[in-house]
């Protein structure tokens, strides 16, 4: 009996993380951490395995800047793929209390792939995404604003 109760408590603790995090599916506007301007509009979707993927559905370049049309410097399978429609975030998984982990983030301008984690604001309108290599302290953060 004690063994069954212990298993139930353990299972509850393990699976509660994904229950507590809000659904982040929808349309998001990215805000560049260096310029403060929007770079793109993304569509975030939840995959059948419960992780999230985000693709670029609109490029919003700052005035006077002509964006690249293809992912020239990107590794396979992204090499020379159109940036519009490109999945730039994959594997983002709910952890707990509006925290998300285990993402892979592609920067289509440099072709670099980063590890990523995110935190959703209390009102569900802002997602702060942190991309990094190795240690989170050595990364960059970007804010995404919910559009719908």
Where are these regions (language model features)?
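Central antiparallel beta-sheet cores of small beta-barrel/beta-sandwich binding domains
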Residues: 30-116
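Bacterial N-terminal signal peptides that target proteins for export
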Residues: 1-8
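Sec/Tat signal peptide C-region and signal peptidase I cleavage site
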Residues: 15-21
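Edge beta-strand at a domain terminus
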Residues: 126, 132-148
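Cleaved targeting-peptide boundary
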Residues: 21-28
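Cleavable N-terminal signal peptides
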Residues: 8-9, 19
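Short, compact, well-ordered microdomains
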Residues: 115-117, 122-128, 141
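Short aromatic-glycine motifs in intrinsically disordered, low-complexity regions
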Residues: 74-80, 128-135
């Amino acid at each position: 009996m004690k063994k069954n109760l212990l298993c139930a408590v353990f299972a509850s603790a393990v699976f509660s993380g994904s229950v507590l995090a809000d659904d982040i599916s929808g349309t998001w506007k990215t805000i560049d951490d260096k310029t403060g301007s929007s770079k793109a509009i993304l569509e975030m979707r939840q995959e059948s395995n419960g992780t999230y993927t985000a693709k670029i559905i609109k490029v919003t370049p700052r005035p006077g800047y002509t964006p690249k049309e293809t992912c020239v410097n990107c590794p396979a399978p992204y090499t020379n793929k159109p940036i519009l429609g490109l999945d730039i975030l994959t594997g983002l998984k709910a952890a707990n209390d509006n925290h998300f982990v285990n993402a892979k983030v592609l920067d289509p301008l440099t072709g670099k792939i980063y590890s990523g984690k995110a935190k959703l604001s209390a009102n569900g309108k802002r997602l702060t995404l942190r991309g990094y290599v190795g240690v989170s302290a050595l990364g960059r953060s970007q804010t995404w604003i919910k559009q719908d």
